[in-house]
Curated annotation (Swiss-Prot):
One of its GO terms (biological process) is D-amino acid catabolic process. It catalyses: glycyl-tRNA(Ala) + H2O = tRNA(Ala) + glycine + H(+); a D-aminoacyl-tRNA + H2O = a tRNA + a D-alpha-amino acid + H(+). It is found in: Cytoplasm. Keywords: Cytoplasm, Hydrolase, RNA-binding, tRNA-binding. This is D-aminoacyl-tRNA deacylase. A Gly-cisPro motif from one monomer fits into the active site of the other monomer to allow specific chiral rejection of L-amino acids. The lineage of its organism: Bacteria, Pseudomonadati, Pseudomonadota, Gammaproteobacteria, Alteromonadales. It comes from Shewanella amazonensis (strain ATCC BAA-1098 / SB2B). Homodimer. A motif (Gly-cisPro motif, important for rejection of L-amino acids) lies at residues 137-138. It holds the Pfam family Tyr_Deacylase. Belongs to the DTD family.
Amino acid sequence: MIALIQRVSRASVTVDGEITGAIDQGLLVLLGVEQHDDRTKLEKLAHKVMNYRVFSDENGKMNLNVSQVGGSLLVVSQFTLAADTGRGLRPSFSGAGTPEQAERLYDEFVAHCRAQGVPTQTGRFAADMKVELLNDGPVTFHLQV
């Protein structure tokens, strides 16, 4: 399971002209599911996302997590993160989870984050989405479990 997280001042996702999720300060989480992902990997990645210290403390050091700054998550499904780009000029998605598996784990990831008390907004699974963000930094990390 892969999460590309970006520290944002604000972010939103729009589907068919309708905003489905929007946050102010927090993390935009692009979430990719791979074939062998399961609940254990989901919980490990969710814990890492929610506790990753990417926000600055009073000394300017990245030492605070999203909850400590009163931030939110915007979680967007992104199967292209599971692409194999090692050969050729066209990505292969053979390692990506099935749509059914990916949707189930995406929904569980969102529910897990919400259950931990982190305000969490979403896009719409498998939809053509328009994502807008104001990247703060920029600060971007690729997390994989």
